[in-house]
Amino acid sequence: MLMPHFPVPTWKNNIKYDLENIARLLRALGNSHLRLPPVIHIAGTNGKGSSSAMLKSIFTLAGYKVHCYTSPHLLEFNERIVVAGEKISDNELWQVCEQVRVASEKFNIEPSFFEGTTAAAFLAFEKTKADILILETGLGGRLDATNIVEQPLITLITPISYDHMHMLGNTLPLIAVEKAGIMKSCVPCVISMQVLEVYETLFAKAEELEVPSFCYEYDFGIKKTDNGFIYSSQNFTYEFPTPSLLGDHQLINAASVIALISLINKQFNISNEVIAKGLQNTIWPARIEKIEPKKYSKLICDNVQIWIDVAHNNSGAQVLANWIRDNLKSSIYLILGMTKNRNIEEFCSYFKDLTIKGYGVKVLSEPLSHSAETIHLEGRKSGIDFSESASLEEAISDIKKINGDNKANIIITGSLYLASDFYKLL
């Protein structure tokens, strides 16, 4: 299903963010959030989805039934709600969303899109038994609809950087306070790699709430090897193979996942061998994803390798640029599409020392996309040679004309919705 029939997405800026609305809605629906399996609650700016995917892969491989709630989605809404390891069916999705619609109208509640879909997900999770629920925040943490869950089993805070400043604050400590809102008294929290001022904010919050924290660089860490990485903590040291998800940042995500499992492993008893295999089997599309040339042979020759990455903020751009610098040698073409709340020049500045040709495109599946002309003009301010194309498909065609049959790489980035546009071309 592309989108549920209810609630209807809105792009209003006056949405009230608090937990009162979701609490009223869940009461009207019978408080399904009180009957969920043990919850792993995840907040952060980057790495939430990758960490969720790794956890899902590991727990599934270990034989556990896994519920998972993530956002946004690539192609269809069902991706967001995984019930006992399977994407929710169209029929079940319609049923739980209809329950939300009926309750909303009966009790005069106007849920936001995320509040309504979160309530629908909880209804689906309540109906089917599972051993664990991986629950990802939508925005922030403290006032996020998922934070209605008062007693998770454990929490994870992935790397925090600048994003959604209009909602979360314009400094890293302010953003960190919002993300730290998922911390609960006496519930362990794994803290992934952060800059110092974020660490200090999270440590202070953990101390205030009496949260047992387990922190990257302080309580556990990694050392990269030729075949993977060595994870070490006060509890154990073990060499794990390279994860299926590419990039050094994914080693840090993997380390945080391993740390999390180690803290709850008395309850689940997952071996390091299963963790290793789970990391190797993780699938999470559009994260430095190498697309098989046969899938896009109608678009361009197989001498050109297409990569997809959903980097959309400065920290994501930095990670992607570092990976390109370390791994790609042939000519590089960057196809960029971004939403209107993104700073194009800042994003592109991370790629300015690379020999790169940029193409700005409008994101067709994003109503609030920057125009191709704006991306072209703003991208040029960073020092990159930018052009504009009428569409993603035309950008690939333009590259084909310039590049011919020579070896090259195309990086499609800037928006998850642009990645979605690409998959629809295949």
Model-derived regions: residue spans:
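ATP-dependent carboxylate-amine ligase catalytic core
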Residues: 13-15, 19, 26-37, 61-150, ...
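Nucleotide phosphate-binding/pyrophosphate-handling subdomain across enzymes
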Residues: 36-38, 127, 132-137, 143-156, ...
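Extended acidic/charged loop-beta regions that coordinate divalent cations
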Residues: 72, 117-167, 199-239
